[in-house]
Amino acid sequence: MLTTTFDSGLICAPVTPEIANKLQLPQMVIENADPKGTAYTVSVDSADPSVTTGISAQDRALACRTLANPSAQPSDLRRPGHIIPLQAKSGGVRERKGHTEATVDFCRLAGKQPAGVIAELVEEGEVVEGVAEISGNNGMMRRDGCLRFGRKWGLKVCTIEDLVEYLERTEGPLASTAAAVNGKH
């Protein structure tokens, strides 16, 4: 997986509230103190007998495919695990302008099950005396870095702003653009 090479190591799987409820994925904590309001649920692995530790790229990919399977049941997942599902707001980026909601909106627009996979990309740093050099963004890749990464690897890159603009153009104005929470994940 490209993500396991260039990300922070934390792979998340945005899902709709309906999927989270169907698969019995409760919030990780009762009182969410995340500054961006990211709705982390309990972590999962696939319950498929082929899964070993759950940490391999194959095991994590299977957990993500299970979350996106419309036929999946709660018993198809083990808890805790190595993938963290994130519960999107019902209104998508119309309600919260975060990566979680954008992922679910992209899946919906593609005609797919509203469950995706995201990971925070990190800036490449030099290792000096065993310590990674970190940029001013705590090593996290921001907009310009993501655009460069996309060009380097031949990947299409779309910003949340691009998605909002597209939705306004094709589905009408957002109900309350100013009221939408500006999230991160």
Residue ranges and their predicted role:
Residues 1-185:
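Catalytic domains of riboflavin
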